[in-house]
């Protein structure tokens, strides 16, 4: 498969965005980002189970590490501290450390919430994005904007926290409902 790699160069950091059909966690990515890590795989409940199983198996194949999964169903109303606290509570109970990694598989809201949780847990841990919606693939996953809503307005609380990698598999778009 031909994949397009785009390097996002920022003042203090950089990361790759890999785009294509069937983009996955290949050996190079696994050895660089996953091997030996404590990983929390956060996915949207709307992602097809088959897709989650493929990604989970791919992560499990890469050697010793701790892998846990958390499924969330979020919307604009639940893009708040309560949802971030669910992630923080999970990380704390499972004793995740500064070297841990969050892998987020979902749309823009889940990317914002899980990115904000990563930015604020232990003053910042790494996270990787696998956006599953068109808007998340072209907007929410690029630029490091993370955050949540407040009762007084949208996206009022947040942080810039860059992902270590963005994997955009365009086949996710097939699973979206049609209007």
What kind of feature is each model-predicted range?
Residues 100-119:
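Glycine/serine-rich anion-binding loops at beta->alpha junctions
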Residues 84-90, 107, 119-120, 138:
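Hydrophobic, well-ordered secondary-structure scaffolds
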Residues 1-101:
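ATP/NTP phosphate-donor binding region
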Residues 45-47, 107-110, 171-172:
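Short glycine-rich anion-binding loops that position phosphate/pyrophosphate groups of nucleotides
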């Amino acid at each position: 498969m031909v994949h397009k790699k785009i390097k996002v160069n920022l003042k203090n950091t950089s990361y790759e965005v890999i785009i294509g059909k069937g983009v996955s966690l290949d050996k190079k990515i696994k050895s660089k980002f996953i091997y030996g890590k404590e990983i929390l795989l956060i996915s949207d409940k709307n992602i097809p189970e088959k897709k989650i199983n493929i990604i989970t198996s791919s992560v499990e194949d890469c050697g010793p590490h701790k892998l846990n999964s958390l499924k969330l169903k979020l919307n604009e109303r639940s893009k708040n501290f309560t949802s971030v606290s669910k992630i923080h509570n999970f990380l704390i109970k499972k004793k995740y450390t500064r070297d841990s990694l969050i892998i987020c598989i979902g749309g823009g809201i889940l990317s914002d919430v899980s990115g904000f949780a990563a930015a604020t847990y232990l003053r910042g841990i790494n996270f990787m994005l696998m956006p599953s919606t068109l808007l998340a693939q072209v907007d929410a996953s690029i630029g490091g904007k993370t955050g949540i809503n407040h009762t007084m307005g949208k996206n009022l609380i947040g942080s810039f926290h860059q992902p270590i990698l963005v994997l955009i598999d365009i086949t996710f778009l097939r699973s979206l409902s049609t209007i």
